[in-house]
């Protein structure tokens, strides 16, 4: 089974950097498993065009995490640029957008992302949990479930593509030869036969 590592984009206010770092820590097992890779603007290297890098990664991420605080809602760039672009990709089915409520915020339920399922569980802000680690575990578990769904859809898509390839005439013809040719003769000619039929297929 093969799948593409899930790209996660962090959309957050720099004033909330400590929250982002804590969340990254709680997602470290997913990273160790090779399931995800992170991107946030602190990864932009000296000399890079920061806006171009943000746009590039925001437009390719499988999952966009919105780290919701009053700082996030007050940031024109977070709200008007990153969040709105993330929601556009969500509407097109290109990305999964997950709002994470970090602190109590007045009015977030009137925002475009209010229609989405938020984390932690029941939308209780991370800072309102008795144990903050419990809150981040709840968030990480929710993100893991989303990742598993995306990987499942990737696997199903790959299986469908393979099936479609196998149903093409060149592959059917090779299958017929495999069934009727003596084992030793076929083994000696297998590579040439496959290449011959692949060349026919590629020319179509």
Language model features: what each stretch is:
Residues 7, 15-150:
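Cross-kingdom TIR/SEFIR domain
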